[in-house]
Amino acid sequence: MWTAPVLLWVLGSVWFWDSAQGGAIGALEDDLVTPGPGDDMVNPGLEDRIETTDTTGELDKSTAKAPLVPTQPPIEELPTSGTSDHDHKEHESTTTVKAVTSHSTDKKTTHPNRDNAGGETQTTDKKDGLAVVTLVGIIIGVLLAIGFIGGIIIVVMRKISGRFSP
């Protein structure tokens, strides 16, 4: 009956499965560290065709290219008339990384299943629930699309074989 066409359709789509697995991934962009304008480093000898030497007056022997030369600090780092030199040095030496979190950093949070004696509350991230709903919606949509396409294929096969009666 309809099992032979469906079996042929499944076997014919096997070659798609290998490409759906994905290929080998090389080095990710996040793992690469390259000096750039943000690092205050330039290589003027490459673009200008000017031979650049290091502090000893010789070319870099390992690459036979001009070494990276630090430039002046960007204009954002230069002190302005409104700030003192002391404030600038303090800002320059202090690096603070602020991360966006879903939990308050000022209050202690407790486990949601334990007694909450201090009256502290725990905040949760509403975006986690949104991600789960989105994932479930995508899965349901893909399953419905597969069923819809399968139904169209079955109707077309029946029409071709002459067993279609509306």
Swiss-Prot record:
<dbReference type="GO" id="GO:0008285">
    <property type="term" value="P:negative regulation of cell population proliferation"/>
</dbReference>
<dbReference type="GO" id="GO:0007266">
    <property type="term" value="P:Rho protein signal transduction"/>
</dbReference>
<dbReference type="GO" id="GO:0051087">
    <property type="term" value="F:protein-folding chaperone binding"/>
</dbReference>
<feature type="region of interest" description="Requires for dimerization and lipid rafts association">
    <location>
        <begin position="137"/>
        <end position="141"/>
    </location>
</feature>
<keyword id="KW-0965">Cell junction</keyword>
<feature type="glycosylation site" description="O-linked (GalNAc...) serine">
    <location>
        <position position="62"/>
    </location>
</feature>
<dbReference type="GO" id="GO:0044319">
    <property type="term" value="P:wound healing, spreading of cells"/>
</dbReference>
<dbReference type="GO" id="GO:0031410">
    <property type="term" value="C:cytoplasmic vesicle"/>
</dbReference>
<dbReference type="GO" id="GO:0098609">
    <property type="term" value="P:cell-cell adhesion"/>
</dbReference>
<dbReference type="InterPro" id="IPR052684">
    <property type="entry name" value="Podoplanin_domain"/>
</dbReference>
<dbReference type="GO" id="GO:0030155">
    <property type="term" value="P:regulation of cell adhesion"/>
</dbReference>
<feature type="compositionally biased region" description="Polar residues">
    <location>
        <begin position="94"/>
        <end position="103"/>
    </location>
</feature>
<keyword id="KW-0217">Developmental protein</keyword>
<dbReference type="GO" id="GO:0009897">
    <property type="term" value="C:external side of plasma membrane"/>
</dbReference>
<dbReference type="GO" id="GO:0043066">
    <property type="term" value="P:negative regulation of apoptotic process"/>
</dbReference>
<keyword id="KW-0472">Membrane</keyword>
<feature type="glycosylation site" description="O-linked (GalNAc...) serine">
    <location>
        <position position="84"/>
    </location>
</feature>
<feature type="glycosylation site" description="O-linked (GalNAc...) threonine">
    <location>
        <position position="94"/>
    </location>
</feature>
<dbReference type="GO" id="GO:0019956">
    <property type="term" value="F:chemokine binding"/>
</dbReference>
<dbReference type="Pfam" id="PF05808">
    <property type="entry name" value="Podoplanin"/>
</dbReference>
<dbReference type="GO" id="GO:0048286">
    <property type="term" value="P:lung alveolus development"/>
</dbReference>
<dbReference type="GO" id="GO:0008360">
    <property type="term" value="P:regulation of cell shape"/>
</dbReference>
<feature type="topological domain" description="Cytoplasmic">
    <location>
        <begin position="157"/>
        <end position="166"/>
    </location>
</feature>
<dbReference type="GO" id="GO:0016323">
    <property type="term" value="C:basolateral plasma membrane"/>
</dbReference>
<dbReference type="GO" id="GO:0010572">
    <property type="term" value="P:positive regulation of platelet activation"/>
</dbReference>
<dbReference type="GO" id="GO:0090091">
    <property type="term" value="P:positive regulation of extracellular matrix disassembly"/>
</dbReference>
<dbReference type="GO" id="GO:0035239">
    <property type="term" value="P:tube morphogenesis"/>
</dbReference>
<dbReference type="GO" id="GO:0030324">
    <property type="term" value="P:lung development"/>
</dbReference>
<dbReference type="GO" id="GO:0008283">
    <property type="term" value="P:cell population proliferation"/>
</dbReference>
<keyword id="KW-0732">Signal</keyword>
<feature type="glycosylation site" description="O-linked (GalNAc...) threonine">
    <location>
        <position position="110"/>
    </location>
</feature>
<keyword id="KW-0133">Cell shape</keyword>
<dbReference type="GO" id="GO:0097197">
    <property type="term" value="C:tetraspanin-enriched microdomain"/>
</dbReference>
<feature type="glycosylation site" description="O-linked (GalNAc...) threonine">
    <location>
        <position position="105"/>
    </location>
</feature>
<keyword id="KW-0966">Cell projection</keyword>
<keyword id="KW-0730">Sialic acid</keyword>
<dbReference type="GO" id="GO:0006693">
    <property type="term" value="P:prostaglandin metabolic process"/>
</dbReference>
<dbReference type="GO" id="GO:0031258">
    <property type="term" value="C:lamellipodium membrane"/>
</dbReference>
<dbReference type="GO" id="GO:2000392">
    <property type="term" value="P:regulation of lamellipodium morphogenesis"/>
</dbReference>
<dbReference type="GO" id="GO:0007165">
    <property type="term" value="P:signal transduction"/>
</dbReference>
<feature type="glycosylation site" description="O-linked (GalNAc...) serine">
    <location>
        <position position="81"/>
    </location>
</feature>
<keyword id="KW-0812">Transmembrane</keyword>
